[in-house]
Design a protein with these regions (language model features):
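Soluble FAD-dependent oxygen oxidases
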Residues: 1-142
C-alpha cells in the first residue's frame, strides 16, 4: 500500500484520515450503521483517503474572481490519475459520498454498494417524479 500511495502522490497530494470508521465500536452500533445508506464496505475500512483540490470562490463576471478553467481541468486530470492508482490497488472499496471523487466512474457501487437497489426503490416510492436530485445521488442516473 505504501508504494500505491507514493505513486498516487506523484500526481496530487493525498490525505489519510484514520478517524472515519467504526473501529472499536460495539457490535450493536455496527449493526445499526449497516441499516443506513452508507456503503457497508466503508464500515470495514482502515482509513479514508482524500485526494482533493480547492480554489478561492469563483464568480463568473466578477473581475478578479473568474473561474480558472484551465487550472481546474489540470487539477481534475491529476486527481483522476491519482485516484485510478488507488482504485486499481483497492478493488471493491467504497467511498463516502460527501467527500468522494466528483468524477467517480462506478459511483453507484462505490458510494452505495449493496444498498443501491434498496435506496433506489425507496427513492422511486417517495419521489416518483425524481424531483429531488443531486450529482451521483440515488436516482440521478435516470
Amino acid at each position: 500500500m505504501a508504494d500505491t500511495l507514493i505513486s498516487a502522490a506523484k500526481y496530487w497530494r493525498l490525505e489519510l484520515h484514520f478517524n472515519k470508521g467504526l473501529s472499536g465500536a460495539t457490535a450493536e452500533a455496527i449493526a445499526r450503521e449497516r441499516q443506513t445508506s452508507v456503503n457497508p464496505v466503508a464500515l470495514d475500512a482502515a482509513c479514508l483517503i482524500i485526494v482533493a483540490a480547492n480554489e478561492r470562490g469563483a464568480y463568473p463576471g466578477v473581475p478578479g474572481h473568474e473561474p480558472n478553467l484551465s487550472k481546474g481541468k489540470t487539477a481534475a486530470d491529476m486527481i483522476t490519475r491519482a485516484m485510478k492508482i488507488i482504485r486499481d490497488a483497492t478493488p471493491g472499496s467504497g467511498a463516502y459520498p460527501n467527500e468522494a471523487d466528483y468524477f467517480e466512474p462506478d459511483w453507484q457501487r462505490s458510494f452505495w454498494g449493496v444498498n443501491h437497489a434498496r435506496l433506489l426503490a425507496i427513492k422511486k416510492k417517495v419521489d416518483p417524479d425524481n424531483l429531488f436530485r443531486v450529482h451521483h445521488g440515488i436516482g440521478s442516473e435516470t
